[in-house]
Amino acid sequence: MAKQEVKKIVLAYSGGLDTSIILKWLKNEYGCEVITFSADLGQGDELAPIREKAFATGADKVYIDDLKEEFVRDFVYPMFRANAIYEGHYLLGTSIARPLIAKRQMEIAKIEGADAVSHGATGKGNDQVRFELGYYHFNPAITVIAPWRDWKLNSRQALVNYAKKNDIPIPVTKKRPWSSDRNLLHISFEGAILEDTWAEAPENMYVLTKAPEKAPNKPQYVEIEFKNGNAVAVDGEKMSPAQLLAHLNFIGGEHGIGRVDLLENRSVGMKSRGVYETPGGTILREAHMAVEQITMDREVMHLRDSLVPRYAEMVYNGYWFSPEREMLQALIDESQKTVNGVARVKLYKGHCRTVGRKSETDSLFNLDFATFEKDQVYNQKDAEGFIKLNSLRLRIRSLQAAAKKK
């Protein structure tokens, strides 16, 4: 669609430097109605001034939608039922938020009769892919405006200059020069000192977690109950998904849980450093795997585990709405029907580890079989035949090798 044909744009708006400048740029370049949409995914105080700021920067209409429960229930929980983790460290806090933002943005575009949507993701990053795959899933004909791929403001200083010229407040300061992205699952940090891969992230960067060495000297035990693979209660208290994750974030943050410093492989091909705080998610994943240990069949678990890296890549690369992710989700959800029980985890100075697990309804742990004491149900002599059959191919190979030496 030609620029002059665009009559109304819905912008995914965070209120940060990039999207504030994009809002003004869209008004200046397209001269049309621009509606901002901000998703409340648990950013906290960041959203407080966003309506006033959007109108002050030129927005014609402002949407601020509370999506916290939908975010955790329909996006975070399905992903955690899969134990998804990218490259062994990243719990996908940013990746899993983008599909929901894209979904709601496209709903607003339909309600408002907008012919274009826009986002603030750069042309170097993963988010441009995640947003736009979501857009096209809901409307294959939508016009997408990605300013970072179009404009000449190709540096942070150029953005600052544009902001000053157009009287846009600049939230980035010399004290906190890095960029951040926050939701109920995590907060991420990129840029500035983190572009030096040898430099340690400064302590004043962290928001959700205490430094482990400054965490309480006494450990805390937390019990998390699961039903069909979803966390439903903490220490016996039933909570909604968003309430539960927020509660675990607070507890985990007090004990320095969930800090990750990662050099990850972006979907566009380059490596990028990110520092993440995911206190509640770290506890949740540990507890979920503990309940699986006592309730999930061995072969089901091993098959599911073999698919986790692929599932995580789908989420990371923006394929949440893809048929392959939905197919894997159906398989994973089937495996979770027996994941009912309670895990007890111990939090202490940055560490979260399981110290107990139980299931009243679906435990596959049978003490009569597993005990090291005398039992009446397991004949240890039976193991001999099992071992001989399982070693047959190894014995044949050894005999063949010996014959070749003669």
Curated annotation (Swiss-Prot):
Which residues of the sequence carry a binding annotation for ATP?
12-20, 39, 120
Q: Which gene encodes it?
A: argG
Q: What is this protein called?
A: Argininosuccinate synthase
One Pfam annotation, family name? Arginosuc_synth
InterPro entries membership: Arginosuc_syn_C (IPR048268), Arginosuc_syn_N (IPR048267), Arginosuc_synth (IPR001518), Arginosuc_synth_CS (IPR018223), Arginosuc_synth_type_1_subfam (IPR023434), AS_cat/multimer_dom_body (IPR024074), Rossmann-like_a/b/a_fold (IPR014729)
Matching SUPFAM superfamilies: Adenine nucleotide alpha hydrolases-like, Argininosuccinate synthetase, C-terminal domain
Q: Subunit structure, briefly?
A: Homotetramer.
One molecular function GO term is: argininosuccinate synthase activity
Binding-site list for L-aspartate? 122, 126-127
GO cellular component terms, A-Z: cytoplasm
